[in-house]
Amino acid sequence: MSSAQAEDEQDYETPSCYELQKHFTHGGVAYTHVNEVWPGVYIGNEETARDRYKLQTLGITHILNAAEGEWNSVDTGAEYYKDMQIHYYGVTAEDTPTFNISQYFYSAAEYIQQTLSDPHNKLLLHCVMGRSRSATLFLAFLMLQQRMSLLQAVEQLAHRRHICPNWGFLKQLRELDTHLQEERRRTHT
């Protein structure tokens, strides 16, 4: 790491929820059912998750359902994909500001990282709309596995998909960002 990068990291401050939301609404891409947001990673909505032909066309080998459960969910499950040779992982997350989605940050990031360890794999990360829960988990992946700041992760994703994590999720991402920045500063001093 160059000294300029180290200095930038030391000067970095986690942006407010309001500042982050500006990145979602200014100059972003139009909403579509699915977008490739990283090599081998697609974020999509329920329609994409249920479209078996589309999944085959995209070459999807793994699915992370960020909306498993009974309320405001996508109830596909592993059984839905059993004849497609798709590895399924689901998390029960509600798209409400009070839901603790941070409990899934590390496990989801690890699942994404393991999936991408084989360059032939392709992952669909989805929720109902593909804008809040799935986007939040992918932002956490970028922060944890790719060592991006929250701002870098938001900029990376917002240029590729129309996202809108709820305020509670943004607060949890901000907490993760603060924790990771403090950890990185400790290791650089």
UniProtKB/Swiss-Prot annotation:
Tagged with keyword RNA-binding: no
Keyword presence, Cytoplasm: yes
Family: Belongs to the protein-tyrosine phosphatase family. Non-receptor class dual specificity subfamily.
Taxonomy, superkingdom: Eukaryota
CDD domains on file: DUPD1
Residues the record lists as binding substrate: 126-133
GO terms for biological process, alphabetical: negative regulation of MAPK cascade; protein dephosphorylation
Keywords, in A-Z order: Cytoplasm, Hydrolase, Nucleus, Protein phosphatase
Protein location: Cytoplasm; Nucleus
Function: Dual specificity phosphatase able to dephosphorylate phosphotyrosine, phosphoserine and phosphothreonine residues within the same substrate, with a preference for phosphotyrosine as a substrate. Involved in the modulation of AMPK and MAPK1/2 signaling pathways.
Domain Tyrosine-protein phosphatase: from-to ranges: 33-182
GO cellular component: cytoplasm; nucleus
EC number in record: 3.1.3.16, 3.1.3.48
Pfam families referenced in this protein's UniProt entry, alphabetically: DSPc
InterPro entries (alphabetical): Atypical_DUSP_subfamA, Dual-sp_phosphatase_cat-dom, Prot-tyrosine_phosphatase-like, Tyr_Pase_AS, Tyr_Pase_dom, TYR_PHOSPHATASE_DUAL_dom
Active site feature: 127 (phosphocysteine intermediate)
Name listed for the protein in its UniProt record: Dual specificity phosphatase 29
Catalytic reaction equation(s): O-phospho-L-tyrosyl-[protein] + H2O = L-tyrosyl-[protein] + phosphate; O-phospho-L-seryl-[protein] + H2O = L-seryl-[protein] + phosphate; O-phospho-L-threonyl-[protein] + H2O = L-threonyl-[protein] + phosphate
